[in-house]
UniProtKB/Swiss-Prot annotation:
It is found in: Cellular thylakoid membrane. InterPro entries: NdhM (IPR018922). This is NAD(P)H-quinone oxidoreductase subunit M. It is an enzyme of class 7 (translocase). It comes from Prochlorococcus marinus subsp. pastoris (strain CCMP1986 / NIES-2087 / MED4). NDH-1 can be composed of about 15 different subunits; different subcomplexes with different compositions have been identified which probably have different functions. GO terms for molecular function: oxidoreductase activity, acting on NAD(P)H, quinone or similar compound as acceptor; quinone binding. Its EC number is 7.1.1.-. PANTHER family: NAD(P)H-QUINONE OXIDOREDUCTASE SUBUNIT M, CHLOROPLASTIC.
C-alpha cells in the first residue's frame, strides 16, 4: 500500500511529511518539511527565522521514534504558531504592509500611540 503525504496547516505554518525535491513535495515517512508564512503576512529577519527553525528542529527531535501522525503534526504547528505570536508581540517580527490582505490575524500591532 502506498503511503500518503500528511500535512498540518495553520494560518502561518504548513508542515508536511515530505522532502522537497526539484520544488516538489515527495512523501518521506521520516522527514518533516516546514513552509512558514506562505501568505507573506510578516516581515521576517534572520534572527526570527532562526528562532522558528530552531524551535521546529527541537520539536521534531523531541518526537524522534514516535509516529508522525496528524496529531503530532498539529501539536508542532500549534507550538510554532505560538512562537510566531510571541515574536510579534515582543517586536521581533512585524506585519508586512504589502501583504495581499491585512487582517492582523495575530492581533493589532502594538505602537506607542495605542499603548
Amino acid at each position: 500500500m502506498e503511503k500518503m503525504l500528511l500535512k498540518s496547516t495553520t494560518r502561518h505554518v504548513r508542515i508536511f511529511t515530505a522532502d522537497v525535491i526539484n520544488n516538489d513535495l515527495v512523501f518521506h515517512p521520516n522527514k518533516l518539511t516546514l513552509d512558514l508564512d506562505p501568505d507573506n503576512e510578516f516581515i521576517w529577519n534572520e534572527d526570527s527565522l532562526k528562532k522558528v527553525n530552531q524551535r521546529f528542529t527541537e520539536l521534531v527531535q523531541e518526537r524522534a521514534g514516535k509516529s508522525l501522525d496528524d496529531y503530532e503534526l498539529r501539536k508542532i504547528g500549534s507550538e510554532i504558531e505560538g512562537l510566531i505570536k510571541y515574536l510579534l508581540q515582543n517586536g521581533l517580527l512585524s506585519y508586512n504592509p504589502e501583504c495581499r490582505v491585512m487582517n492582523y490575524s495575530m492581533g493589532l500591532p502594538k505602537t506607542k500611540e495605542v499603548l
